[in-house]
Curated annotation (Swiss-Prot):
InterPro entries: HtpX_protease, Pept_M48_protease_HtpX, Peptidase_M48. The chain crosses the membrane at residues 13-30, 34-51, 145-165, 181-201. Belongs to the peptidase M48B family. It comes from Mycobacterium ulcerans (strain Agy99). The active site is at residue 136. This is Protease HtpX homolog. It is an enzyme of class 3 (hydrolase). NCBIfam families: PRK03072.1. Its EC number is 3.4.24.-.
Length: 286
């Protein structure tokens, strides 16, 4: 079984560089003061998210902590995988919902939490559950919460500067010698471009977690089988498309909403399931 993590890492790095380049461009329009204010706002907001990501996600899913007596298989699998990776044991939670999904959150391995829904526990066999938990632990070990917050901070800066461009275009463009139509165009396209790049970062991290999770468990075909089941299960029992749940959808192992409720692929937080399965099957073939 071969694993090529560097391609996804390079892609993530280049996407973050691209977002930084957008910020430099916007900063050139408004000068240093506006750029500093936007950066301070975005960093402050995302620092809060970084340190509270576990609480926000667990609360949104109404997740409850479980003991080893309540979830013996889940505890045994996670303990074995954590020991294999030489990492601490995370806190385990279960969300009482029929929607088949799982997620991990927490800013580092010592503050990590892993949550499974009752739907996914009922749907998967133990081999598939092990593969899913390996995927989720890989998100923690790869520091994906930190990467997500960096991408979020950069996107927030771009959005804040784009809003400034909009107001400048409407009220101050001609007076300041700037083209108001150009400013309004930038204000419209900037947030869209930032969102597209941010979602691309999220999709890149999903591929990375698929690969590193498959290496951790040594069983890429089990993860492929689990993803196939989860994809079908979501169509039967999706999460309700509520804003609080939508804000946490990027943490899930698969898009938790029914196909008709998804937005375009450029704005999706997850790669197509079929593509993920194909990559895992290629890994298994070596």
């Amino acid at each position: 079984m071969t694993w090529h993590p560097h391609a996804n890492r390079l892609k993530t790095f280049l996407l973050l560089v691209g977002m930084s380049a957008m910020i430099v461009f916007f900063g050139a329009l408004f000068g240093r003061t506006a750029l500093i204010l936007a950066v301070l706002f975005a960093v402050g907001m995302n620092v809060y998210v970084y340190f509270n990501s576990d609480k926000l996600a667990l609360r949104a899913m109404h997740a409850q902590p479980v003991s080893e007596l309540q979830a013996p298989a889940m505890y045994r699998i996670v303990r074995e995988l954590a020991a294999s990776a030489h990492q601490p044991m995370p806190r385990l939670y279960i969300s009482d919902t029929a929607a088949p999904n799982a997620f991990a959150t927490g800013r580092n391995p010592r503050n990590a939490a892993v949550c499974c829904t009752t739907g996914i526990l009922a749907l998967l066999n133990e081999r598939e559950l092990r593969a899913v938990l390996g995927h989720e632990l890989s998100h923690v070990y790869n520091r994906d919460i930190l990467i997500s917050c960096i991408a979020g901070a950069l996107a927030s800066v771009i959005t804040a500067l784009a809003n400034m461009a909009m107001w400048a275009g409407m009220f101050g463009g001609k007076r300041d010698g700037q083209n108001p139509f150009a400013l309004l165009l930038v204000s419209l396209l900037g947030p869209i471009a930032a969102t597209v790049v941010r979602m691309a970062v999220s999709r890149s991290r999903e591929y990375q977690a698929d690969e590193s999770g498959a290496v951790l468990t040594g069983d890429p075909l089990a993860l492929a089988s689990a993803l196939r089941k989860i994809s079908g299960g979501v169509q039967l029992a999706p999460l309700p498309p509520e804003p609080q749940l939508a804000s946490q959808a990027h943490l899930m192992i698969a898009n938790p909403f029914r196909a008709g409720e998804r937005i375009g692929s450029l704005f999706s937080t997850h790669p197509p399931i079929e593509d993920r399965i194909r990559r895992l099957e290629q890994m298994a073939r070596g």
